[in-house]
């Protein structure tokens, strides 16, 4: 299998599991194409044409040596150390979950997904976009000085394929959890925690002292309407959004991780927050993707935080 095929599979699975729905994703792509067509010649040369077919700016082929992928090393975070490990293990391809290179530099662009998901939960789209605007700009500025291409340069020197797949995997996790939690019909926050711990990735994370936790609320707190708004969408959104979520009638948020300022804002808005866990949630989405690759005959080795669980 060539690297482009792995990339295409990731995008396809990401779109199919996108909480916004396939029609909304296709609409976003159509709008992107229309904007591109209106650009002048110079702007078109600067435009990232992958955005015409890939709605996830944090997912990209970073180095392709044009040789088939047969043995893959996959990890949540990939650096030069993991690239050298891949060389030692004779892997021809490395899959990073967290974005690298130009995918990291443009991470903030995928955060617009959050506003569209919030709108589906009842937060007016104009309010969601307005609240997130400043946070998206903040993330963009924060990422700007990072040495984005450090690991990509290592991949080139070692001549090992490198790809990062972020939001598609997070979409898979969010979609899985959305269906799972709806089926469980929890009435209290404690019941959400119990349900999450029945999922193998979270069950193993408990043993690593990194299992699901209540950040706001208590086990006895009623859940109200549940929103999975903080599993996918690039990175942590705006802390001001919790007040708007409460006004939209939401009672509980399930997320991967939560900063202290965000926690305080959720508490002030009386929104329960369940943090499922970062590496465990990443592992859930990655596993659903890796299962597909394994079913297609690729050999897989996991490292760097992945709790590997095979489902099919």
Q: What do the predicted segments below correspond to?
A:
Residues 1-93, 99-267, 271-312:
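Non-catalytic interface/targeting segments
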